């Protein structure tokens, strides 16, 4: 950098390109005063320091532009020769941009004597303020969309379904899933069951202490209930789920070593409550079945009658009870693993057989295993009746591609109201039927896996029985388990056959791999 000294040993100069302040005063952002032209400033004179002046930044840029002007003119001439067929206004716009840029540089340098400084930026002075996501030179900025490498802990963020508006809290009728007024009462019960079963998430289980489910599905319309956003959670890819104590499912305390698998009475109570409600649901569906399903509806069309609830409420409750049973069985498997240290088989046999249901081979006590099998069998019976009603409805319409019920013929089975985001599937019965069949298949697949995993537990020492002991091997109870295994296999085959028939009427010839 060329420097010119005034006073002292330097030559006196009145070059207008020099700064108004000497280098020391300019660096310290201080005013520069001198007694006469060519003399040292007051501060340099008092400090006995050399007083030098440098050319301002604005004048240096102007000098550089003048030196580079011939080269710039030559380059511009070459560009004009290469693009001589382009419109002239493009060259004019480029020249105007160059002039505006030069004018902005001059305006920025007018106050350079006062504003120019070499101070650090806030992010450089305080590293904590620096954000790697906003730095274009930082390598992490291009990788910030990957949750596994993002330098921010995403486990603390809860993305709720209600906040994003992607899905409704429940797959089917929110009136019977998330709270519904019981007949003759004014209290409402809120449950936090979601479609987590379909995506592998543990469902938010209902509490028996709060009242559980309504004993009888109401015939009223949908009930609007405000749920907190924290009640629902969506997991990000690559990020483990995070549960807070406010919405974490209630887990039973680990049982003591050597105790039966069902040591906690809370699981027994929930299992018996679920079985009782499954029986009431099965009784309500079976008692309303008609002989001629192609003419008379399964349930009356009216949803205002207190004595005749609609079929949609019973179908919706069947899905809900199946989801709750899945949660109970998952809790039993987890508790069994914690108490015995034995992990149940992850890939059990896909079909229920008599040897799989042998009580001698199970870690559960006979009564608990019987309740588990009874609940699963009730669900199979309920879905068998509902699938037959769907098949009769599809046959009554006479359509093989579209499942639209004529206005003159009431539907044999009314499906639950399914709403995905802002899309109400009530107007598209074919899509509602396909989605309902997918739900049935998913629930039965999960239940079959859990039931067979529980039935294939190794025998617990506390439950080990001799094959000669009266009441087990060769007894009526053991023979009953054989018959139950055959009945379960028959129900599964029947449901698969009906689902294939319905899909064939809807235009879907293919069938999924087994229930």
Curated annotation (Swiss-Prot):
Residues 74-89 have a biased composition (Low complexity). It is found in: Nucleus. Residues 62-110, 125-147, 231-263, 336-361 are annotated as: Disordered. Residues 98-110 have a biased composition (Acidic residues). PROSITE patterns: ZN2_CY6_FUNGAL_1 (PS00463). Its main location: nucleus. Keywords: DNA-binding, Metal-binding, Nucleus, Transcription, Transcription regulation, Zinc. This is Transcription factor himB. It comes from Aspergillus japonicus.
């Amino acid at each position: 950098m060329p420097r010119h000294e005034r006073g002292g040993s330097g030559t006196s100069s009145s070059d207008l390109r020099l700064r108004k302040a000497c280098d020391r005063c300019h660096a310290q952002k201080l005013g520069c005063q001198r007694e006469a032209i060519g003399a040292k400033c007051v501060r340099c004179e008092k400090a006995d320091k050399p007083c030098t002046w440098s050319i301002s930044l604005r004048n240096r840029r102007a000098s550089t532009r003048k030196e580079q002007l011939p080269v710039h003119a030559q380059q511009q001439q070459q560009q004009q020769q290469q693009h001589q067929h382009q419109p002239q206004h493009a060259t004019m716009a480029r020249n105007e941009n160059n002039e505006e840029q030069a004018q902005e540089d001059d305006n920025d340098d007018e106050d350079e004597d006062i504003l120019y400084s070499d101070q650090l930026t806030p992010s450089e002075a305080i590293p904590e303020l620096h954000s790697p996501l906003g730095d274009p030179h930082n390598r992490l900025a291009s990788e910030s969309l990957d949750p596994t490498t993002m330098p921010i802990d995403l486990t603390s963020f809860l993305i709720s379904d209600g906040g994003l508006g992607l899905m409704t809290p429940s797959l089917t009728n929110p009136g019977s899933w998330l709270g519904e007024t019981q007949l003759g009462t004014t209290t409402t019960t809120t449950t936090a069951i979601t479609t987590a079963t379909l995506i592998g998430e543990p469902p938010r289980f209902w509490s028996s202490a709060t009242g559980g489910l309504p004993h009888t599905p109401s015939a009223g319309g949908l009930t609007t209930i405000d749920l907190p956003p924290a009640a629902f959670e969506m997991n990000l890819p690559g990020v483990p789920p995070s549960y807070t104590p406010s919405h974490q499912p209630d887990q039973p305390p680990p049982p003591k070593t050597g105790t039966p698998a069902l040591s906690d009475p809370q699981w027994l109570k929930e299992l018996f409550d679920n079985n009782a409600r499954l029986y009431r649901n099965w009784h309500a569906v079976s008692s309303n079945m008609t002989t001629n399903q192609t003419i008379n509806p399964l349930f009356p069309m009216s949803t205002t009658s207190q004595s005749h609830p609609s079929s949609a409420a019973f179908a919706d409750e069947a899905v809900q009870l199946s989801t709750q049973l899945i949660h109970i069985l998952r809790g039993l498997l987890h508790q069994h693993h914690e108490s015995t240290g034995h992990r149940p088989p992850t890939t059990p046999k896909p079909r229920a057989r008599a040897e799989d249901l042998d009580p001698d081979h199970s870690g559960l006590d006979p009564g608990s295993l019987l309740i588990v099998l009874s609940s699963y069998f009730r669900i199979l019976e309920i879905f068998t009746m509902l699938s037959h009603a769907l098949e009769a409805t599809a046959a009554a319409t006479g359509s093989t591609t579209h499942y639209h019920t004529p206005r003159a013929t009431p539907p044999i089975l009314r499906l639950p109201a399914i709403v995905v985001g802002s899309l109400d599937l009530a107007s598209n019965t074919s899509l509602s039927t396909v989605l309902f069949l997918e739900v049935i298949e998913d629930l039965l697949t999960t239940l079959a896996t859990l039931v067979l995993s529980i039935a294939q537990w190794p025998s617990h020492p506390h439950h080990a029985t001799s094959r000669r002991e009266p009441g087990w091997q060769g007894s009526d109870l053991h023979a009953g388990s054989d018959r139950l295994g055959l009945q379960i296999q028959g129900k599964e085959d029947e449901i698969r056959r009906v689902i294939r028939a319905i899909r064939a009427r809807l235009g879907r010839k293919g069938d999924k791999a087994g229930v």
